[in-house]
Amino acid sequence: MGLVQRYKGKKLGGLKMETIIPVLSIVAMLFSALVGIAVPVVLYIVYRKKGANHLPFWIGCVTFVLFAFVLERLTLTFVMKLPIWTTITSNLILYGVVAGLFAGVFEETGRFFAFKTVLRKKRGNDQNALMYGAGHGGIEAIILLSATMVLNSIFAIQFNAGIDSPFGGINEAQTLINMPFWMLLIGAVERLAAITIHISLSVLVWFAAKNGKRFWLFPLAILLHLFVDAVAVILSGAGVSVWIIEGAVYVIAIAFVILAVSVWKKNHTVQAEEKPAADAPVEVIEAPAEAAMEAEAETETQA
């Protein structure tokens, strides 16, 4: 028996079970899920047209999962068991800095490791830095945004139909019913800035891995990653409006883009096969028949 039929006419936690999750909210969830998938796909297509290889995109996906979802979380699980964790969580600023530090160290180290190893032979094409960033930030959007919104949409449809769902219960339904539909679009807005940041940081680490004299860009990327994550965590924990938080993140993202463009212009090299020299002299090779005729004519003249 479904949730609606089971509790019809009753109240549970202040929620009348005749109430349904608004269709507009479901549409917003599906739209956000689409954005999370579409943006990485579009970036992949664009960068392929610009000459990037396909491999960096997939390496970016794998690297994010390995370093952020596996290694970072395993390490964080260990640290959370230490006595010092109570001190960290009791101070919002300290917590924000530590959270940002974990993300920065693991994700930027993952980038650097990927560029130095599996993508070593692809470093001649700087477009691959952008392609990697699209994969790194894209898989994060798909996991954190698209997957979540798809599951929420399925739950909402099942709940409205009176069908029990493995994806949630009364509390989840009440949250979605009371939430304005536009709140469900914020994730999509946030992911656009996040992917932009990932691509920008990928450019910094790319040139750090490519040129030993630019190694300082690697620790800089860690600090920048720490900064943006710390700002988001601290503002959110302080109860600041979500729009102010997103505005701050977008300002930071724009600053990162400006920095990445500057680094790109100073360090970018064009592959020879990408842009052949227009003024290169053209060597004319004579056809064998023509060469033979000229040789014969020269012999007759000498005779």
Cite the ranges covered by each PLM segment:
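Short, Lys/Arg-enriched N-terminal segments with co-localized hydrophobic residues
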Residues: M1-K16
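Hydrophobic alpha-helical segments at protein termini of multi-pass membrane proteins
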Residues: G13, M17-A303
